């Protein structure tokens, strides 16, 4: 029998249906000479540092850097049962070969291979590589299963990425956490992304707005401008000089311009536009596209290509026709698609651009959740636009000369709306309308025409600061980060991959280093402080972009994985050496993160709230008040934070409701600290006289 392993149960179910594996078992399906099972994402992962040595369970500066010579792997907590199922199936004597049917990409390859290796499996396996979960695509994929060796380098790159993230994350996080006494999460891609947010925020906070003035002259429907005059006095002087004077059309240029259709969606571009049009976060968009993929309504989501292959031309035409029939928004659209414009075999590596599938023909779109309908409309719109006609317009540029000054204006007239007609139809359906540049048409004039008695006016303006990043603009910045450091022949990857960028943004928010305000992403105080204290090799998008390019070269067989990891180990070692200690003031940059309730009666240091106790912050001092202690427990009372604060402040505290076995009723008393400096703190009780 053949064991097929998918990435998640829903995908396994789609595959099992096609293969005829309809008999449900515990953790798998069986039938037709196939057993189909699944992972739940990553079932096996790199082991925690404490698995290598018990002393790593505590975070200590002296233990850094941590760099395993031989890597260990462990089954992900709470997923042990499914790993047990897969391991048992791999060892089943009926199984003679396997099919890796996890997602067709770097992470999917890693998910399967780690389970395969951890289970100690040596049986041969092949690779299912598909871009759609439609029945026809699954059948085609199983008819053309690929040799697993074709993906050894993909696995090598995935494992290298995982190890690099572990080395940078474990060492960077432990280093700066122990130095600053606050958990500071450092990540190979996460940290330079945060640095971009902080840099933008800094530019905004230090921005000094400058005033400038525009002078306008005109007659009737024709107005031209002299922009960015520095002073109001000068602007008013120019306006006064031109008021009621003659203006001559000294220059008139007319040019027909073309705006080519946009490319098809890759994941990042789709996430950007879903954020701009709908306000969806990158993670929300990825989740929605993944759901639609599993419903067989969209092709594979985690792609970085914006093209299709030439053998997909007939399918693309069919899908365009289905989109116009099935999506009510485009029901009136009629186009003659130019498929050649979106076809380029050389620009499709693992997966083609995101498209609707022919399965859309059978779907009642109105029955889908609104959020899924929005994504389908967006992808459908882009397909129609990308294969539509060019948008052409006539642009007119006019210069008016008046009293020695040149005033300019520009207008345009649409010649052929082309693909923009579909985009305008889509934008008109949005609740929040996008502010497009208004199309300004100009009256017909000729060079040399004279305007008599023009009017002149002055308007005041201010320079504007850069805008905070939205997920749209941050994704764009991540995609191009560090690109200027590479030559034109280098394939550039930026920060992260289409599959990981959404998760990186979410980690920044969950770690408390960034927050969302409306559509904007803004660094928090802790986020700004973290970037300030980290060295450039950790915060630099350039270095991380170089790493991403090296990973891509490992995947292509052009770089060595061991050399890549050795370089990262050296970098983290240098990082630890560069931070041997901090001044007391610098160590308090992030605050203690602890609640102080008073001063230690022994040494005067702050006393903090701990887990079940109130302890002196001075490590050389042993003073500690325990919530559950013999004295208070005997009186059926707990030493609360309020009592502890009073004891530290005054040395005594009046406590009510104390218990004694000698009398049936409760009593009140004054409790005093009676500390002699020993291992345990003593108390003394006094009664009212």
PLM regions: where:
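Conserved short loop/turn motifs at secondary-structure junctions
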Residues: 1, 101-104, 181-183, 254-263, ...
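Intrinsically disordered, low-complexity regulatory segments
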Residues: 1-159, 166, 465
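Basic, low-complexity terminal or inter-domain segments flanking catalytic cores
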Residues: 2-3, 79, 90, 173, ...
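Amphipathic alpha-helical transducer elements in NTP-driven molecular machines
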Residues: 9-16, 33-36, 40, 76-87, ...
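C-terminal or mid-to-C-terminal helical accessory/interaction module adjacent to the motor/catalytic core
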Residues: 93, 135-219, 254-258
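Phosphate-rich ligand and nucleic-acid binding surfaces
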Residues: 221-223, 253-254, 324
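Metal- or metallocofactor-binding catalytic centers and their adjacent structured scaffolds
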Residues: 232-265, 271
């Amino acid at each position: 029998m053949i064991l097929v392993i998918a990435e998640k149960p829903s995908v396994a179910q789609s595959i099992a249906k096609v293969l005829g594996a309809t008999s449900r078992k515990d953790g798998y399906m069986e039938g037709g000479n196939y057993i189909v099972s699944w992972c739940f994402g990553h079932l096996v992962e790199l082991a925690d540092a404490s698995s290598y040595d018990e002393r790593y369970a505590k975070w200590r500066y002296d233990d850094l850097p941590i760099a395993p010579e031989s890597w260990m792997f462990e089954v992900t907590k709470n997923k042990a049962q499914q790993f047990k199922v897969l391991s048992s199936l791999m060892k089943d004597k009926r199984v003679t070969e396997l099919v890796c049917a996890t997602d067709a990409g770097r992470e999917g390859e890693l998910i399967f291979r780690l389970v395969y290796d951890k289970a100690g499996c040596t049986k041969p396996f092949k690779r299912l590589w598909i871009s759609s979960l439609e029945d026809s695509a699954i059948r085609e994929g199983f008819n053309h299963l690929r040799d697993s060796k074709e993906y050894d380098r993909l696995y090598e790159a995935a494992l290298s990425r995982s190890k690099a993230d572990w080395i940078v994350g474990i060492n960077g996080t432990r280093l700066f956490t122990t130095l600053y006494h606050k958990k500071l999460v450092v990540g190979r891609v996460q940290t330079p992304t945060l640095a971009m947010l902080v840099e933008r925020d800094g530019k905004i906070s230090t921005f000094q707005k400058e005033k400038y003035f525009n002078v306008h002259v005109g007659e009737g429907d024709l107005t031209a401008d002299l922009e960015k005059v520095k002073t109001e006095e000068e602007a008013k002087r120019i306006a006064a000089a031109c008021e009621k004077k003659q203006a001559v059309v000294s220059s008139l240029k007319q040019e027909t311009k073309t705006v080519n259709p946009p490319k098809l969606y890759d994941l990042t571009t789709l996430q950007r536009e879903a954020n701009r049009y709908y306000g969806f976060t990158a993670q929300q968009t990825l989740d929605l596209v993944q759901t639609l993929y599993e419903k067989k309504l969209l092709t594979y989501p985690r792609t970085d290509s914006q093209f299709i292959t030439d053998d997909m031309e007939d399918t693309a035409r069919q899908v365009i026709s289905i989109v116009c029939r099935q999506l009510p928004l485009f029901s009136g659209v009629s186009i003659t698609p130019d498929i050649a414009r979106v076809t380029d075999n050389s620009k499709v590596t693992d997966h083609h651009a995101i498209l609707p599938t022919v399965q859309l023909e059978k779907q009642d779109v109105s029955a889908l959740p609104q959020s899924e309908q929005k994504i389908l409309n967006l992808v459908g719109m882009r397909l129609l636009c990308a294969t539509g006609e060019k948008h052409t317009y006539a642009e007119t540029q006019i210069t008016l000369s008046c009293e020695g000054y040149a005033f300019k204006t520009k207008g345009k007239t649409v010649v052929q709306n082309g693909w923009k007609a579909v985009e305008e139809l889509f934008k008109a359906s949005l609740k929040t309308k996008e502010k497009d540049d208004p199309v300004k048409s100009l009256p017909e004039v000729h060079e040399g025409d004279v305007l008599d008695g023009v009017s002149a006016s002055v308007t005041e303006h201010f320079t504007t600061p850069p805008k905070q990043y939205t997920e749209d603009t941050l994704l764009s910045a991540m995609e191009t980060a560090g690109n200027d450091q590479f030559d034109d022949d280098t394939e550039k990857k930026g920060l992260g991959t289409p599959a990981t960028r959404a998760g990186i943004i979410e980690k920044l928010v969950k770690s408390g280093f960034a927050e969302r305000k409306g559509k904007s992403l803004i660094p928090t105080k802790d986020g700004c402080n973290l970037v300030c204290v980290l060295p450039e090799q950790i915060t630099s998008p350039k270095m991380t972009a170089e790493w991403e390019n090296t990973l891509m070269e490992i995947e292509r067989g052009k770089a060595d994985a061991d050399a890549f990891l050795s370089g990262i180990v050296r970098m983290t070692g240098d990082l630890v050496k560069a931070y041997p200690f901090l001044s007391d003031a610098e160590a308090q940059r992030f605050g203690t993160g602890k609640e102080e309730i008073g001063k230690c009666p022994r040494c005067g240091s702050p006393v903090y709230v701990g887990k079940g106790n109130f302890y002196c912050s001075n490590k050389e001092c042993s003073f500690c008040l325990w919530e559950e202690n013999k004295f208070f427990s005997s009186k059926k009372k707990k030493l609360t934070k309020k009592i502890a604060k009073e004891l530290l402040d005054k040395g005594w505290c009046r406590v009510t409701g104390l218990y004694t076995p000698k009398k049936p009723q409760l009593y009140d008393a004054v409790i005093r600290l009676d500390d002699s400096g020993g291992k345990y703190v003593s108390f003394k009780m006094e009664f009212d006289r």
